[in-house]
A protein has these predicted regions:
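Short active-site-adjacent structural elements
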Residues: 89, 104, 134-135, 158
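Membrane-water interface of transmembrane alpha-helices in multipass transporters/channels
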Residues: 138-152
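Structural signal for membrane-spanning alpha-helices in multi-pass inner-membrane proteins
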Residues: 132, 136-137, 161-164
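Membrane-helix cytosolic exit motif
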Residues: 150, 154-174
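Alpha-helical transmembrane segments of integral membrane proteins
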Residues: 120, 124, 145-146
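Short active-site segment of divalent metal-dependent hydrolases/proteases
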Residues: 67, 132, 156
């Protein structure tokens, strides 16, 4: 289910594992992942991440083992379950509770929502600067009106940023 959700969001998924070929092949087949590599050392995992970065990708590394720690550090972003080795948790950008991968989808959704809000906030700030600063400079609005508009734009930016938290508050995934 998680793999299907990620694919629906346009995410390409690969397994790059240090485990045996038969085990990796079985997991990949069970979850529907066609690109996988087994028997990978930490340096090989890093090489794959670097290759993806050179192609303009932003790889998210998900790992839990000792040998995943260097690759977690190399990923554009990385997450690890709370059951992971301590070094993997330390090297990951975020740690999620449990072992199920549902938080990967939620993390992606929250990050995309945050990015949208940031772009909206830039638009609000630019809009203020394009409209009210020239009007104030030309004397078409009083300093009081310009100050009120500046405060209103700051409040609008803050309120818009708070929408991310409100959007995700109370949501849980099964």
């Amino acid at each position: 289910r998680i793999v299907a959700e990620l694919r629906a969001k346009g995410i390409e998924i690969e397994i790059v594992s240090g485990d045996r070929e038969d085990a990796v092949a079985e997991v990949a087949r069970a979850v529907g992942i066609s690109i996988w590599k087994s028997g990978q050392r930490p340096d090989q995992k890093i090489a794959r991440i670097e290759e993806l970065k050179k192609r303009g990708r932003h790889p998210l590394m998900v790992g839990d083992g000792l040998n995943d720690a260097p690759a977690l550090a190399a990923g554009h972003a990385s997450i690890s379950p709370s059951s992971a080795a301590d070094i993997s948790q330390t090297m990951a950008d975020a740690v999620f509770q449990g072992e199920a991968l549902a938080p990967v989808v939620e993390t992606l959704d929250v990050s995309r929502s945050t990015q949208r809000r940031a772009l909206e906030n830039f638009a609000i700030a630019i809009g203020y600067n394009v409209v009210f600063v020239p009007l104030a400079m030309l004397g078409h609005v009083t300093p009081l009106i310009a100050a009120i508009a500046m405060s209103a734009s700051s409040i609008a930016v803050t309120a818009n940023a708070l929408r991310v938290g409100l959007e995700w508050q109370g949501r849980t995934r099964a």
